[in-house]
Amino acid sequence: MELPCFEPRLDADQAVDRTDRLTPTSFLLSTLRSLLGRSDDADPDVTVLYYPDYLAYTTVTLRRVGRSDKDDKFIAAVDAATGRVGEVDVTLPDVETREVADERVVPIEYDEADAEREWDEWLFSYVDRTYRPIKQPETSLDRLELVYTPYYVVDYGPDEDRYAISALTKQVELLEDIPPLADAYTAPASRA
C-alpha cells in the first residue's frame, strides 16, 4: 500500500544508537563493551512501523479591541489511533510517498469526521489558554491531511526492553508506553 509518510530524520542504525544512550550507565557499558571487543550481545531486531496522524491546518482570527484583526496559523495533530490532539511543535519535514506492507501500518481508529470532531473539542480550550481573547475568535480548519510517521521498534529480545523511536522527533520511548504501536508490533503478521 502507498502511504504519505514524513521523511525520516534518522535511520535504523541511529535509532539503535539512541537506545544505547538512555542512561549514563547503559551508554558507558555499551562504549566499554565495544572498546574491549566484548560485545557478546546479539544485534537487536529493528522493525519499522508506520503510525497515522491527521494534520489539521488551522487559522484563528482574533478580534482585538481598538486594533485590527489578527490571523494566526498553526498546525494541530490528531492521533488517528487514539484521538488525542495537540499542537505540532516541531518543524515538519517533507512528506514522501512510500510503498509499505499492510502489516507494518498501525490501524486507523478515527476517520476524518472523528478527527475533525476531536480537533473542534480541543481547539476552544487551546485558543482560550494560548491567546486569552476578550472576544470569541473565529476559527477555521483549512485542511485535514493524513500522514504517517515512521517508528523504529528496537527489540533486544524477550527478556529485555523494547523501544519505539520516532523517525520524526527522534524521541525514544518504551514500546509498551504507546499501546497502538505495541499492538501492531505484537501482531503475528508484523513480525514476519
State the predicted function of each range.
Residues 171-172:
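Hydrophobic "anchor" residues
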Residues 166-167:
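Short, acidic, Ser/Thr-enriched surface-loop or helix-capping motifs
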Residues 1-152, 156, 160, 179-192:
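Charged, low-complexity helical/coil segments in non-catalytic cytosolic or luminal regions
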